[in-house]
């Protein structure tokens, strides 16, 4: 950017009268030839404004500090149209009182953000892009600024430049100078707030990032303006933190830093579980040797705790006053031993009491027993004068393995047992319900079968009655038909007899008396009568046959219709019976699954 008026030297702007102008030749006609920062006006800030640096908490806020509001005629933002008269020149907020000290600026409250966003009085506010016509031009300028800035400080091949040289870029120099003054603890503070140096004098310059992780994420993902500059910032930050022996914390680790429990709570315990009982002396015998409790006597004293065995320690002087209660080799046995141990603790007769302020006798002359869970040193002391098979055998085992895991397994088994018990109860309830339902259904089935037998017998009786009635009606019907047939036969016989009589009369007629003519006439008349009768008989036979045929056809047709009607009647009966059976069909029995 030779020939431009940009600020050099890398230092932050001081408290002098104003910023130096940085300009760049425009690559596009019609655009402004450079960018300017508005002069610093001391009248815009309340005189006694204090801007203390945060100590990582971000809680310090300016008191009574605000930017003066811009004049109404300059408010081209929030949807107002762009002034058509001149090319808009973005004017940024005045510099900080102490220079570009990002970490030293207090984060404004919600009400102060709105005030700080406004430009100072007397300056022209930056006009938003309403119609979207100049966005690409601004982006091109930003990319050009980045290219020029990098090429001004060092050669274009960034991969060959040293890390320290890249940090002296004018965009990052002040940021890394501040970063170098902080310790690792201060850098990793999640409450420390930062501005993005790559967004300086542009959109997002006033945004705060709580911790370096959000800042690095912003630099990695920035995709609209100054993309190369943001990527360079992300790479430099990661390299800087790596060289200083730290890294950017993941987002999930930014909050909630607490010290938890120890990694392991396991310990070694004596197995099988044992409780040492001290002061079990009784008295000395004639040989000046101590006598003490017996095994059963010791078990009886602590019968509430279900110890399985008892042993006593003996030495050259007899009973050593040290006894042990051995419990079952299980998690339950350990819990019993621990319960006895806690009983001694609550009573004030535990290990500490025995070692620090042992009181062997209580008022009345009785010996006070002390007890505690056995450890390895106790067992070695117990076996001090024991050799070979007389030594009390034990081993040191993992508490988690022998107690915790077994208790968890017992809990799971108990839950499984409860589940199986509940399941068994439900199964028994279901079985009982099914049995009751089966009894009810069986009773109903039995009653239904009896009802069906009764209905069938009644139906059979009715059927027999109907058959007898139909048979009787059929006999009457056949009798009437037989009577008709008999009457018809009688009529036919009478008719034939009449024909024969008339023919006989004609044949017996005297045709020989009288004249020849008369005889001839009488013969012709008789012959004609006989011929006519024969002819009539022949016609009668023909017509009778036709009548019989017609009658038989009618009978056949009537029988067919009757059979069809009977068949239809049987079908109707079958359909009605099927519907009745469907109506009274018993429900399907299914065992309840609930």
From Swiss-Prot:
Arranged from A to Z, the UniProt key words for this protein are: Coiled coil, Developmental protein, RNA-mediated gene silencing
Q: Which GO terms describe its biological process?
A: defense response to virus; regulatory ncRNA-mediated gene silencing
Where along the sequence do coiled-coil regions lie?
408-509, 545-577
Q: Where is the composition biased (Acidic residues)?
A: 136-157
Q: Segment Disordered: which positions?
A: 1-163
Q: Which Pfam families match?
A: XS (PF03468), zf-XS (PF03470)
Give the tissue specificity. Expressed in a dome of cells at the tip of the meristem that extends into the adaxial side of the initiating primordium. During the later stages of leaf development, expression becomes restricted to the margin and vasculature.
Residue intervals passing through the bilayer: none
Alphabetized InterPro entries for the sequence: SGS3, XS_domain, XS_domain_sf, Znf-XS_domain
Positions with biased composition (Polar residues): 39-49
CDD domains according to UniProt: RRM_like_XS
User: Is Coiled coil among the key words of this record?
Assistant: yes
Similarity-based family = Belongs to the SGS3 family.
Role of this protein: Required for the biogenesis of miRNAs and trans-acting siRNAs and essential for the specification of adaxial/abaxial organ polarity. May be involved in natural virus resistance.
Spell out the protein name for this chain: Protein SUPPRESSOR OF GENE SILENCING 3 homolog
- Organism for this UniProt entry: Zea mays (Maize)
Q: Which gene holds the coding sequence for this protein?
A: SGS3
């Amino acid at each position: 950017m030779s020939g431009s008026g940009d600020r050099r030297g890398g230092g932050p702007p001081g408290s002098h009268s104003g910023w130096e102008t940085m300009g760049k030749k425009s690559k596009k006609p019609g655009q402004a030839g450079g960018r300017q920062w508005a002069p610093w006006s001391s009248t815009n800030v309340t005189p006694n404004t204090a801007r203390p640096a945060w100590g990582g908490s971000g809680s310090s806020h300016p008191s009574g500090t605000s930017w003066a509001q811009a004049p109404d005629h300059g408010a081209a933002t929030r949807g107002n149209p762009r002034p058509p008269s001149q090319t808009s020149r973005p004017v940024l907020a005045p510099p900080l009182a102490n220079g570009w000290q990002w970490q030293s600026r207090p984060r404004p409250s919600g009400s102060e953000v709105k005030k700080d966003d406004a430009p100072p009085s007397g300056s022209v506010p930056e006009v938003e892009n309403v119609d979207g016509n100049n966005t690409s031009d601004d982006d091109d300028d930003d990319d050009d600024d980045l290219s020029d800035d990098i090429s001004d400080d060092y050669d274009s091949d960034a991969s060959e430049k040293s890390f320290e040289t890249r940090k002296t870029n004018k965009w990052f120099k002040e940021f890394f100078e501040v970063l170098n003054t902080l310790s690792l603890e201060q850098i990793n503070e999640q409450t420390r707030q930062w501005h993005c140096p790559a967004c300086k004098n542009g959109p997002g310059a006033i945004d705060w990032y709580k911790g370096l992780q959000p800042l690095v994420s912003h630099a990695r993902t920035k995709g609209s303006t100054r993309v190369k500059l943001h990527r360079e910032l992300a790479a430099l930050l990661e390299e800087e933190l790596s060289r200083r022996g730290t890294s950017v914390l993941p987002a999930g680790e930014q909050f909630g830093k607490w010290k938890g429990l120890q990694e392991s709570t396991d310990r070694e315990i004596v197995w099988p579980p044992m409780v040492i009982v001290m002061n079990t002396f009784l008295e000395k015998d004639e040989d000046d040797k101590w006598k003490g409790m017996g095994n059963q006597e010791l078990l009886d004293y602590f019968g509430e705790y279900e110890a399985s065995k008892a042993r006593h320690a003996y030495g050259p002087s007899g009973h050593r006053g040290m006894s042990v209660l051995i419990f079952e080799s299980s998690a339950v046995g350990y819990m019993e031993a621990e319960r006895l141990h806690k009983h001694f603790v609550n009573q004030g007769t535990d290990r500490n009491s025995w070692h620090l302020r042992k009181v062997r006798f209580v008022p009345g002359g009785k010996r006070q027993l002390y007890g505690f869970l056995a450890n390895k040193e106790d067992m070695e002391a117990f076996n001090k004068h024991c050799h070979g098979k007389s030594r009390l055998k034990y081993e040191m085992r993992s508490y988690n393995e022998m107690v915790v895991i077994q208790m968890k397994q017992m809990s799971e088994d108990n839950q499984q047992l409860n589940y199986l018990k509940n399941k068994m109860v439900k199964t028994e309830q279901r079985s009982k319900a099914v049995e009751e339902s089966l009894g009810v259904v069986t009773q109903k089935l039995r009653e239904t079968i009896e009802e069906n037998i009764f209905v069938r017998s009644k139906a059979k009786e009715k059927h027999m009655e109907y058959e007898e009635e139909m048979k009787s009606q059929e006999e009457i019907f056949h009798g009437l038909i037989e009577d008709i047939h008999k009457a018809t036969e009688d009529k036919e016989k009478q008719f034939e007899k009449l024909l024969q009589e008339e023919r006989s009369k004609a044949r017996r007629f005297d045709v020989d008396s009288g004249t020849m003519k008369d005889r001839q006439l009488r013969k012709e008349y008789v012959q004609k009568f006989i011929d006519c009768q024969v002819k009539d008989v022949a016609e009668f036979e023909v017509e009778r046959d036709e009548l019989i045929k017609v009658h038989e056809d009618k009978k056949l047709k009537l029988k067919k219709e009757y059979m069809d009607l009977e068949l239809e009647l049987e079908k109707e009966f079958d359909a009605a019976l099927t519907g009745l059976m469907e109506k009274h069909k018993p429900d399907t029995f299914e065992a309840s699954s609930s």
